[in-house]
Structure formats: structure tokens, C-alpha cells
Amino acid sequence: MWWSGMHNTNLMLTLYGDGLAEYEVTSNNLTITDVVRLESKNYLFVYLDLATTKPGNYQLVLEHSQKASIQIPYELMERREGSAERKGYDSSDFIYLIMPDRFANGDPSNDAHPELLDKPNRKDPWARHGGDLQGIIDHLDYIEELGVTAIWNTPVAEDNDPEGSYHMYAASNVYQIDRRFGSNDLYKKLSAEMKKRNMKLIMDYVVNHWSLEHYMIKDLPAADWINQWDSYT
């Protein structure tokens, strides 16, 4: 999913699956400008030009001479009116930095998740302690009373490292709020509750800090995808 009407009309899609580099990519209604293949045979990087593409549902077709074709639906959404004019944060803001795992535990039921490796242990300073998005929501009145105009959370995308994941600077799924914090919908609720208070929400997302559990680290598109040395890599 992406949006039409963006100032930058170029878009790169990363397609990942077993042997996808062996396929050819076509589309009857999307303008494909380039298709890039790297060392791993499981990736296709498809470049699109969306300059004249309207909002709607589209389709990419992957074809192989000896295998069944694959149809991939893709949605372009319409941008909200005035979205390009949103004001960001600046030097006039009072920014409150929160490490969510260490702030407040609003929902003890999500402290651990069966699919996520690192478990809570309040006695271990290197382990998770149970703070979450609900804990932040529960304390918004307190934060507002301090005069805060913007909250900057350290990353909240899933970090499935087996230990030390509380700081969240090693994303394993950049599209999923870590389920020990809540859900994507709960993050939207946090944003909505802050908007009622005229407060801004800053999302911290570091694109070169990925977990060993991220699929692009487990299966590198190319050897030079990340810096690699004899030690500390």
C-alpha cells in the first residue's frame, strides 16, 4: 500500500519469496521503470513511476516459463486533504522522550508473547520490564500537565532479538508494533488521544538498525547489503 499524489512520484517495491528473481514482472496499469535483481535469488526490486497513477487497486503479474504465474494486488490510496501541509516538531516544542518498556505497564497481559523471544524479568536490568503503549495512554494527562507538546518514543516496531530487546533499536518487522507494547490499532489510539490534547507524536525508526531476526538480515539480498567486518558484525 502507498499513496498517490506524493511529491516524489518514484516508488520501489521489494518483493520477497522463494526464487522470485527468476520471474519477469509486468503490469497492465502500473508504469514499471526498472526491475533489479541481486545476489539472492529470492528478491525482486521493482521501480514504479506513479506520476499519473490515480488512487485504486492495481496488480503486478510475475511470470515464469516453467512455473505458474503469481498475481500480486497493490493498493494506491488517496492522500488526506492537507496532509502535505502538516507541521512537524520544531524548537518551540517541549519534547518528552520515553523508552516505552521502562515507562508504565498499562496491560500486564502482553508482557510476554509466545512468538517473541525476549521475556520479561523486572530483576534483570538487561531484560524487558513490561512497559507498553497503554501505559503511555494512561499517563497522558500527567504528561500534558508537565507542558509537554510532543512525545518521542524510542522505537516501537517489533524487535525479536533473544535478549536486550527492551530498547527496541533492532527491528525484526518494521510494519508491526511489537505485540509486547500492544498493536498497530493501539498505536493509532495513542496518536488520536494525543491529537485531542494538541500533542505531537514522533515515531523513532532507524532504517539501518535491524534485528538478526529480520528476513533481510537472515537472507541478505547481497553481500554488501550491510557493513561486514571480522568482528563486531
State what each model feature region is.
Residues 3, 33-38:
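Short amphipathic beta-strand and strand-loop transition segments with alternating hydrophobic
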Residues 3, 76-97, 102, 106:
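Low-complexity, Pro/Ser/Thr- and charge-rich linker/hinge segments at domain boundaries
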